[in-house]
Structures are given as structure tokens and as C-alpha cells.
């Protein structure tokens, strides 16, 4: 029932089965995968390629500029496409209604043919990507929280180093408020801080001694 394989045939079959994948061409590797074949036919990741995408029917200006653009490009090889479009747009505006009418008729004929060929066609314009703004201003909520944090931190500073703390905190608070808060709000906060410092100066010596003994010394950088 079973045929006897020669040693040479068996060796050739084993070598054919043990051929590594990197020894084969990329075309053979792609054609063995049905998913890859579908990707090749549709162009990329399974979506329709630009060639299979249905284009909009031409309007009257596009019908007129189709030949005019080619003529201007041949006459001015160094002219860019944007400059050619501007020139064609200006020339189209200078035409009279009688001169434009044949191109409107041709555009209507092309649109009728397009509707017959693609009855379910709907124009879907591509959305432009929004630019990401990297430089954003500090929100008002975060700036107010920063001011409250600065005031709370200064309350824990000893009396002997309060002047240095206020001098270090006031420029930072003013810089944050200048970009997000009005000037009058910054002035009111500074006045509140000065009032707090002046009231602490009128404390009794016993209260000051208690604060100095309870709080650890603060060494400004």
C-alpha cells in the first residue's frame, strides 16, 4: 500500500520543510497570509485606499481649470501650485456669466452621471487635526490655591525669619498672579499678608518665646 521513499527523496523533503522563514522573499511571506493579502488589496490596515475612494463630482470651476491649470503649468514651470490656484481663481472671477455657462452645463452633466453610478454616495469631508497648545496659562483656581498655600506656609515660619519668608514669597506670588489674576486681587492678598505680619509684631514677649521654643529653626536658602 505505501510506497517506499528513497533516502535522497526523504532528505530533500526534510530540507524543504526546514527552510527558515528569513530565507524566503517578503512577497512569498505576504502571499501565504490571507490577512496580508486583504491588506494589500485594500491598501494598508483594511480600509479603502485612496484609489478606491469615490471622489466628488467636479463643479464648473474645476471643469474650467482642468485644462487651464495644465496650460499655466507648462508656460510657467517654476510657479508653485498655490500661485497657480490664485491666478486661476482671479481669472475665473473675471469671466462673464455667458463664458461660464458652458462649464456649468458640463458640471451638471457630470453630477448626473455621478448620481447614477453612485446612488448612495454622501460627501464626508475629512476633519482637520486640531493643533495642540503646549503653552497654556495657569488656571485661576490653581493660582488661588497656590496663594493660599503660600500664606499657610508663612504662618508656620518663626517671627525672626518672617521678613525673609515674606520677601521670598511675595515675588513668587506676584509672578503667578500677573498671568492669571487681576492686579487688584494681588494687591489685596499682599495687604492681607502685611496686616498679618504687623499684628504678629504686637504679640507679647511670652507668646513670641513660646513660638520660638515650639517651632524648629528655619534656615532660608
Swiss-Prot record:
GO cellular component, one term: cytoplasm
Principal subcellular localisation of the protein: nucleus
DNA-binding region per Swiss-Prot/TrEMBL record: 54-122
Protein's UniProt keywords contain Transmembrane: no
Residue spans crossing the bilayer: none
Database matches in InterPro entries: HMG_box_dom, HMG_box_dom_sf, SRY, SRY-related_HMG-box_TF-like
Molecular function in Gene Ontology: calmodulin binding; DNA-binding transcription activator activity, RNA polymerase II-specific; RNA polymerase II cis-regulatory region sequence-specific DNA binding
Entry keyword Nucleus: yes
A Pfam family matched in the record: HMG_box
Keywords: Activator, Calmodulin-binding, Cytoplasm, Differentiation, DNA-binding, Nucleus, Sexual differentiation, Transcription, Transcription regulation
Compartment annotation: Nucleus speckle; Cytoplasm; Nucleus
Family: Belongs to the SRY family.
Subunit structure: Interacts with CALM, EP300, HDAC3, KPNB1, ZNF208 isoform KRAB-O, PARP1, SLC9A3R2 and WT1. The interaction with EP300 modulates its DNA-binding activity. The interaction with KPNB1 is sensitive to dissociation by Ran in the GTP-bound form. Interaction with PARP1 impaired its DNA-binding activity.
Role according to the record: Transcriptional regulator that controls a genetic switch in male development. It is necessary and sufficient for initiating male sex determination by directing the development of supporting cell precursors (pre-Sertoli cells) as Sertoli rather than granulosa cells. Involved in different aspects of gene regulation including promoter activation or repression. Binds to the DNA consensus sequence 5'-[AT]AACAA[AT]-3'. SRY HMG box recognizes DNA by partial intercalation in the minor groove and promotes DNA bending. Also involved in pre-mRNA splicing.
Name of this protein: Sex-determining region Y protein
Protein's organism: Hydrurga leptonyx (Leopard seal)
Gene for this chain: SRY
Amino acid at each position: 500500500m505505501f510506497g517506499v521513499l528513497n533516502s535522497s527523496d526523504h532528505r530533500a523533503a526534510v530540507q524543504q520543510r526546514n527552510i527558515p522563514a528569513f530565507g524566503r522573499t517578503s512577497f512569498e511571506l505576504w502571499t501565504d497570509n490571507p490577512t496580508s493579502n486583504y491588506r494589500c488589496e485594500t491598501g494598508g490596515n483594511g480600509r479603502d485606499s485612496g484609489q478606491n475612494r469615490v471622489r466628488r463630482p467636479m463643479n464648473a470651476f474645476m471643469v474650467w481649470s482642468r485644462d487651464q491649470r495644465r496650460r499655466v503649468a507648462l508656460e510657467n514651470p517654476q510657479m508653485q501650485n498655490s500661485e497657480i490656484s490664485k491666478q486661476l481663481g482671479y481669472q475665473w472671477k473675471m469671466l462673464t456669466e455667458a463664458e461660464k455657462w458652458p462649464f456649468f452645463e458640463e458640471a451638471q452633466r457630470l453630477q448626473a452621471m455621478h448620481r447614477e453610478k453612485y446612488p448612495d454616495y454622501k460627501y464626508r469631508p475629512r476633519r482637520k487635526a486640531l493643533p495642540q497648545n503646549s503653552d497654556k496659562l495657569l488656571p485661576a483656581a490653581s493660582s488661588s490655591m497656590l496663594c493660599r498655600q503660600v500664606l499657610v506656609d508663612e504662618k508656620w515660619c518663626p517671627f525672626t525669619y518672617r521678613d525673609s519668608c515674606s520677601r521670598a514669597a511675595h515675588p513668587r506670588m506676584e509672578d503667578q498672579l500677573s498671568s492669571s489674576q487681576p492686579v487688584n486681587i494681588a494687591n489685596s492678598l499682599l495687604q492681607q499678608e502685611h496686616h498679618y505680619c504687623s499684628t504678629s509684631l504686637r504679640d507679647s514677649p511670652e507668646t513670641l518665646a513660646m513660638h520660638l521654643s515650639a517651632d524648629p529653626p528655619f534656615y532660608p536658602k
